[in-house]
């Protein structure tokens, strides 16, 4: 078995989820090397948020940052061949005018931030999702770019890590707990792990 490294340019704590694996992928893609990713469980993780996430991506939000990052993620997964752009509906029941107003505000925010979201009628919502009872809703928000990561974001996380490791620029260490951070002069200079200490120029 390979020896756990004593130093690295970058240490990623929490490699097994979609965020940690994406960080490794993007660092490698940007030319970084000597990257060590660790996770306290398997890679991809079987206990983290990614392992039980819905895998549904919805780009429409009141936050410009959320709209941008989710839109980026959708395009990223799509280019990998791991996205199903099935669209997403949010409905407002008859009599719930506050909900209807909130959906309209959300659509306004989404349009301002570049998404393809729009308001649709109850009949249009019914046509998209026949199980809806048309007379019970007054309208809906429709985002045609919403969809599902396939087969799972957990699977994609594993693919991203595997591809990064194959370049020789990164290492993946599963079942490796981060026990503590070594901080000197306000800067993290290393990580104590269950496999030993690793010095690092950068810790994520």
Model-derived regions, located:
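Short, flexible hinge/linker loops that cap or flank conserved catalytic cores
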Residues: 2-5, 29, 197
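Beta1/beta-strand and adjacent pyrophosphate-binding region of the FAD-binding site
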Residues: 2-19, 36
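Gly/Ala-rich phosphate-binding loop of Rossmann-like dinucleotide-binding domains
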Residues: 24, 28-29, 163
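Glycine-rich FAD pyrophosphate-binding loop
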Residues: 28-49
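Short beta-to-alpha linker loops that shape the active-site pocket of alpha/beta-hydrolase fold enzymes
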Residues: 41-43, 125, 160
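Dinucleotide-binding Rossmann-like beta1-alpha1 core, especially the glycine-rich loop
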Residues: 53-129, 138
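A short, glycine/Asx- and small/polar-enriched loop/turn
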Residues: 129-137, 182-189
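Helical element adjacent to the flavin cofactor pocket in flavoenzyme catalytic cores
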Residues: 142-202
């Amino acid at each position: 078995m390979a020896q756990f490294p004593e130093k690295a340019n970058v240490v990623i704590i929490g490699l097994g989820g979609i965020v940690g694996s994406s960080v490794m992928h993007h660092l490698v893609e940007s030319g970084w090397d000597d990257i060590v990713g660790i996770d306290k469980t398997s890679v991809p993780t079987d206990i983290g948020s990614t392992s039980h996430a819905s895998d549904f991506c919805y780009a429409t939000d009141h936050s410009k940052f959320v709209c941008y990052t989710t839109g980026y993620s959708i395009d990223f997964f799509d280019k990998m061949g791991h996205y199903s752009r099935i669209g997403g509906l949010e409905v407002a029941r008859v009599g719930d005018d506050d909900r209807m107003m909130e959906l309209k505000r959300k659509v306004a925010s989404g349009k301002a931030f570049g998404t393809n979201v729009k308001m649709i009628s109850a009949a249009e919502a019914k046509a998209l999702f026949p199980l809806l009872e048309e007379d019970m809703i007054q309208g809906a928000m429709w985002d045609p770019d919403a969809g599902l990561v396939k087969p799972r974001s957990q699977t994609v996380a594993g693919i991203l890590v595997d591809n990064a490791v194959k370049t020789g620029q990164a290492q993946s260490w599963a079942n490796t707990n981060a026990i503590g951070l070594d901080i000197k002069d306000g800067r993290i200079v290393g990580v104590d792990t269950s496999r030993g200490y690793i010095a690092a120029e950068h810790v994520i």
